[in-house]
Design a protein with these regions (language model features):
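A domain-start/cap signature at the N-terminus of enzymes
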Residues: 4-49, 75, 79, 104, ...
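Acidic catalytic loop of the alpha/beta-hydrolase fold
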Residues: 182-185, 247-250
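Short, proline-enriched alpha-helix->beta-strand connector loops that line the catalytic pocket
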Residues: 169-174, 234-238
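Short substrate-entry loop that stabilizes the transition state in hydrolases
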Residues: 43-90, 152, 158, 164-165, ...
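Primarily recognizes the serine-hydrolase "nucleophile elbow" in alpha/beta-hydrolase
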Residues: 65, 120-172, 183
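Short, solvent-exposed loop/turn and secondary-structure capping segments
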Residues: 61-66, 91-93, 144-145, 166-170, ...
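Short beta-strand/loop motif that positions the catalytic acidic residue
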Residues: 176-178, 182
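Gly/Ser-rich "nucleophile elbow"/oxyanion-hole loop immediately N-terminal to the catalytic nucleophile
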Residues: 41-46, 92-137
Length: 267
């Protein structure tokens, strides 16, 4: 797992849109919602924005310190948002997932839409280069965002699946990174060791290849990592990275690979 320097606690963070990490609170549906924002020094005009969604039991602070996005943003010159889920989880609109947000009917799609809009109003972000990614429940949430919004140029899920019924999906580039030995969100689909019971990673990949009107995928294998990449209409792409024997985890290569995929998408 990628590790980074631990950021400051929420209480000591500035609330303005400053260089470095800041903390922001917005009202969504009568509920105060919070997100962290990392803004690197020397940010160009019209910078990309990556929205990183934590897993169940995770948090915005944990996601910022665990996955190496801030360090990559320094070199890639993009902004990273880390929304905080209610009760450390996300309501993904399906599959009984997950936790308190699902039980209380929290509208996390509305929250993330509002957080992105807040950032676009206050930071020089290119609205055509906004991306969502997440781990586990956060990865599932990234699919829910792809199914229910049109604001993302690409999404990338790690150890996730698609639980939203996704009746009216928007064409969007999609990458899934998933291990074949994942017991919580099984690569082959079906009932996991906890509550997740969803489609297989190849089936989700096929769904989005169909949505995006993709050609036949090209497949390459390097040791225990197999990459399937399909080119699609309007230069979008749909990719599945399969880790033979990989578990329910964020691989060391995931952050860099996701950013390379995002940066290559049309906008």
């Amino acid at each position: 797992m990628v590790a980074g320097c631990s950021p400051a606690d929420n209480e000591s963070l500035p609330s303005g849109f400053v260089t470095g990490t800041s903390i922001h609170s917005i009202n969504v549906g009568g509920r105060a919602r919070v997100y962290r924002l990392y803004r690197p020094a020397g940010l160009p005009v019209s910078a990309p924005l990556v929205v990183m969604l934590h897993a169940v039991t995770g948090s915005a602070e944990q996601a910022e310190s665990s996955y190496g996005w801030d360090e990559l943003a320094d070199s890639g010159r993009f902004v990273v948002a880390y929304p905080d889920g209610v009760g450390r989880a996300w309501n993904v609109n399906g599959g009984g997932c997950c936790g308190r947000p699902q039980r209380e009917g929290v509208d996390d799609v509305a929250f993330i839409r509002a957080a992105v809009a807040d950032i676009v109003r206050n930071v020089s972000v290119d609205a055509s280069r906004i991306y969502a990614t997440g781990m586990s429940n956060g990865g599932i949430m990234s699919y829910t965002l792809a199914c229910n919004t049109g604001i993302f140029a690409a999404i990338g899920s790690v150890a996730g699946t698609q639980l939203d019924s996704c009746r009216s999906p928007h064409p969007v580039s999609v990458m899934e990174i998933h291990g074949t030995s994942d017991k919580l969100v099984p690569y082959g689909g079906g009932q996991g060791s906890n509550i997740i019971n969803g489609p297989s990673a190849p089936d989700v990949n096929a769904f989005w290849r169909n949505v995006n009107q993709c050609g036949a995928p090209s497949v390459t294998t390097d040791s225990d990592v197999t990459t399937s990449t399909a080119g699609c209409v309007d230069n979008r792409g749909v990719a599945l990275i399969t880790i033979d024997g990989g578990g329910h985890e964020w691989p060391d290569f995931a952050t860099q690979t996701l950013w390379q995929f995002f940066a290559a998408q049309p906008h």
